């Protein structure tokens, strides 16, 4: 792969946590952490041609990004892609097609970096990209964390008036069960063929691989509690893990205090 598109995608609204994509995280705009990780990755790969695009229906988010990253191409999101029931893959396909039309380029793959994953390192992106380079037969690489629960051992579902194992098994110890992973939504590496030729709206209806990240570095931010917990974890990671601190130090402070809200 020689030509890549990096995307940052975020909606204006969020039912669980209002304006979460505009929040400051540890004193800096949340979106800047993904952009700084992308910039560090780009600086390490001068042999690649890489463009960065922001797909959003939030003018506030677009202005915030443009203030410090004017090279990022803004793709205003249409109303048809703004709802919370729109499959993520439709936004990816929209971004990919519009960028190819706009730039006249044919990208080999897209790397999507989720805004609500500020504790992602440049090496995490490197690992996912390397896996995609090694395995040309895989259409998608998902970033994942080792799961703390296992459907073969300690996960239940409600069936009528009682509970049952999610997957029936005879395992008596977690170590006996197959290893499973949580998809953490931090990084997706998706080949062009999937985005252009595949009509299926479900990402895992493909041949895919995984790239493992540190589990404590990723929490789904769906509430104020999640956000505060991630900030507390961040302080520990910044103090003890230089690879996390690199993105923090490379991230600009907020240009406008208004984005605290």
Indicate residue ranges for each PLM-predicted region.
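N-terminal nucleotide-binding beta1-loop-alpha1 segment
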Residues: 1-18
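A short, N-terminal amphipathic alpha-helix
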Residues: 30-49
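Short beta-strand/loop segment that forms part of the nucleotide-sugar
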Residues: 49-57
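Short phosphate-binding loop-to-helix
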Residues: 59-109, 127
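Conserved core of the sugar-phosphate nucleotidyltransferase
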Residues: 90, 109, 118-207, 211-213
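Short aromatic-hydrophobic micro-motifs that form the base-stacking/packing surface
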Residues: 111-113
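Conserved alpha/beta core of the MobA/IspD/sugar-nucleotide pyrophosphorylase nucleotidyltransferase superfamily
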Residues: 181-252
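Single conserved hydrophobic/aromatic residue that forms the stacking wall/gate
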Residues: 250-261
């Amino acid at each position: 792969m020689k030509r890549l598109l990096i995307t940052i995608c975020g909606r204006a609204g969020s039912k669980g946590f209002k304006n979460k994509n505009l929040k400051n995280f540890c004193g800096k705009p949340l979106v800047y952490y993904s952009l700084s990780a992308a910039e560090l990755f780009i600086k390490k790969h001068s042999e690649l041609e890489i463009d960065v695009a922001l797909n959003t229906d939030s003018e506030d988010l677009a202005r915030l990004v443009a203030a410090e990253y004017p090279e990022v191409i803004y793709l205003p999101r249409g109303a048809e892609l703004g709802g919370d029931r729109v499959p993520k893959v439709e936004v990816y396909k929209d971004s990919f097609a519009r960028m190819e039309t706009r730039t006249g380029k044919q990208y080999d793959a897209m790397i999507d970096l989720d805004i609500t994953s500020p504790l992602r390192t440049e090496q995490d992106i490197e690992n996912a990209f390397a896996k995609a380079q090694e395995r040309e037969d895989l259409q998608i690489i998902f970033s994942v964390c080792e799961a703390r629960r296992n459907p073969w051992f300690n996960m239940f579902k409600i069936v009528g008036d009682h509970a049952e194992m999610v997957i029936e098994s005879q395992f008596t110890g977690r170590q006996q069960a197959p290893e499973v992973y949580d998809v953490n939504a931090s990084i997706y590496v998706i080949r062009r063929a999937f985005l252009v030729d595949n009509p299926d709206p479900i990402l895992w209806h493909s041949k895919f691989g995984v790239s493992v990240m540190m589990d404590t570095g990723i929490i789904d931010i769906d509430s104020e509690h999640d956000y505060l917990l991630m900030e507390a974890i961040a302080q520990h990671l910044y103090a003890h893990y230089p690879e996390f601190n690199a993105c923090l130090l490379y991230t600009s402070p907020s240009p406008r205090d208004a984005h605290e809200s």
